[in-house]
Regions:
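Structural marker of alpha-solenoid helical repeat scaffolds
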Residues: 55, 89, 423, 457, ...
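Amphipathic alpha-helical substructures
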Residues: 43, 72, 77, 251-297, ...
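Juxtacatalytic substrate-recognition/specificity segment
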Residues: 110-236, 243-253, 263, 270, ...
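Helix-start (N-cap) detector for alpha-helical repeat units in TPR-like alpha-solenoids
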Residues: 25-27, 60-61, 94, 394, ...
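Register position in tetratricopeptide repeats
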Residues: 38-39, 72, 106, 406, ...
């Protein structure tokens, strides 16, 4: 079985070892069945399971496989029953015990969630805590369904199952990803077991690009189906990262920068080119989760996405489709040879030449964003923000500015933040704090410059988009306000201020349906508080 890992989301790999799922040999009779499951051929796997149980009703391997099929179908309680029956016959099999544990833990989580549906997806989320996510999640997934279908020519016939874990323990239970995986490698989503899983953005300080992560996971689902689960990790990850924003952004012109070239990714690629130190496609196996640092993980995604950029520039949409189809019957090097007419080594060399020719430039102040699981303490976010400031002098001055602002002295706080910027001029945290206090003093125009600079360094900060929304709202630039506030929802959808502003904005631009949705969301957030 081949699998792949991704920044902000990981396709299942060797991480299941903690559950013992790979701890024993697979019964040869069901090896093909496992391959059917992991390539999403669920109906065929179900036929095999039914036939096997019918012929050998007291066969532990047959009952175990029947449990796996039910698990992949989302029938978790029935899966537990099948695993129990198998364990009653042979209780020593660690792999079987692992599957039973995973099924039981998943059932314990999912039974607390509400089911939501759209034409092509079934979503499970905690209604009380995460119910506001459902309409945004399903809208994103439906747009991804259409955009990726147009790009790659695949539309799943069955509804795709999606699960949003409400917190880190629940996410660990259903995905096997740990707290370390989230905070050290950015693993907040996973595609496995015939479904997509992410952790709620509410569970992380400052949120994350959760809707793009859903689209990213859906891409993995599509790639598995199109390649019969034979795509190598670099292709999996590269395609998922390259296409994950297609649901919200049109295909850029041929000579324009693709969306994967974020400030951090550009900087990492520039450094890799200068030092000739790449992660390399082979080192991405068996999973990016095993790379040592967040920077290595992010560089791996940047390399993989740029390889897809290279393929797309040279072979276009048809080339990507042919590559995936060819992988169903040939190895990766053979597929490269067939599609590109060159060896895999030549492909890698040409890709690096392509990168050199892009004229990438490092972005001063950019760095890999690290995720942090939120605690129950409000001050935790302030502590996390301060730790993001690398300069000790800037950190001290920022902390002093916070204390001064807490005493109601906005003008003095602004001066202190400006002093902090002298020591760390590209810090998004300080730039945002300065902009926020300027807005507080109704100096909206002055807030634009620090916010633009913050966005240039870090385009994934919800705070920057919220403050820009306030600036545009005050100036009655409602279309611009709409754009940045909707961007904030895509990162941290739990800020009531965003929806207060959006109610005004949607009303002003004449969008009654969105106005109603924003009002409902605002009411739910304020009532919950």
């Amino acid at each position: 079985m081949k699998s792949a890992a991704l920044f902000f989301s990981f396709l299942f790999a060797a991480i299941v070892l903690s559950f013992g799922l790979e701890g024993a040999e697979v019964d040869p009779k069901f090896k093909q069945g496992e391959e059917l499951l992991d390539a999403w051929h669920i109906a065929q796997a179900e036929e095999l399971a039914a036939k096997s149980v019918r012929e050998s009703p007291k066969s532990a391997p047959a009952l175990e496989f029947d449990g796996r099929v039910k698990f992949y179908q989302g029938r978790y309680q029935e899966a537990v029953k099948s695993f129990d029956q198998a364990l009653a016959i042979d209780s020593q099999n660690q792999r079987r015990q692992g599957w039973k544990l995973l099924a039981q833990q998943t059932q314990d989580v999912i039974k607390t969630l509400r089911r939501y549906e759209s034409p092509h997806f079934v979503l499970f989320a905690d209604e009380k805590r995460d119910g506001i996510l459902a309409p945004y999640a399903l809208e994103t997934l439906e747009k991804s369904y259409q955009a990726i279908g147009t790009e790659l020519g695949f539309y799943p016939k069955e509804k795709v199952r999606v699960e949003i874990a409400p917190d880190a323990p629940a996410f660990n239970a259903i995905s096997t990803l740990s707290l370390r995986d989230i905070e050290e490698t950015g693993a907040v989503g996973i595609c496995k077991f015939n479904k997509l899983m992410i952790i709620s953005p509410r569970a992380l300080s400052f949120g994350y690009r959760w809707v793009d992560s859903l689209s990213h996971e859906y891409l993995h689902y599509v790639i598995v189906a199109l390649s019969n689960n034979q795509a190598p990790i670099w292709l999996h990850e590269g395609m998922a990262r390259f296409y994950e924003t297609r649901w919200r952004k049109p295909v850029p012109p041929k000579d324009a920068a693709e969306d994967y070239l974020t400030p951090a990714n550009q900087t990492l690629l520039v450094q890799a080119l200068e030092k000739n130190q790449f992660v390399g496609f082979k080192n991405m196996e068996p999973s990016l989760i095993h790379l040592e640092t967040p920077e290595q993980v992010q560089l791996a995604y940047a390399e993989a996405a740029s390889a897809i950029d290279f393929i797309n520039q040279n072979k276009g949409q048809a080339g990507m489709r042919e590559m995936l189809t060819t992988l169903t019957e040939r190895s990766t090097p053979e597929a490269i040879e067939k599609v590109f007419g060159m060896s895999f080594e030549s492909f890698e060399s040409r890709w690096k030449d392509f990168l050199k020719g892009k004229g990438l430039k490092g972005i001063e102040g950019s760095r890999v964003r690290k995720l942090k699981i939120k605690t129950d303490q409000r001050e935790d976010e302030e502590i996390v923000e301060l730790k993001e400031i690398q300069s000790a002098v800037a950190r001290q001055r920022t902390h002093l500015g916070d204390q001064i602002l807490g005493k109601g002295r906005a003008e003095a706080a602004a001066r202190e933040y400006q002093r902090a910027l002298q020591a760390s001029p590209h810090s998004p945290v300080i730039l945002n704090k300065l902009a926020r206090v300027l807005i507080q003093m109704n100096r909206y125009d002055e807030a634009r410059a620090p916010l633009k600079k913050a966005l240039d360094v870090d385009p994934d900060s919800a705070s920057t988009y919220v403050q820009l929304g306030r600036v545009h709202h005050a100036a009655k630039n409602y279309q611009e306000a709409r754009s940045v506030l909707e961007e904030a929802v895509q990162i941290n959808p739990f800020n009531p201020l965003v929806y207060r502003l959006l109610v005004d904005v949607y009303t002003a631009v004449g969008d009654p349906e969105k106005t109603k949705q924003a009002k409902v969301t605002l009411d739910r957030l304020t009532t919950a508080k």
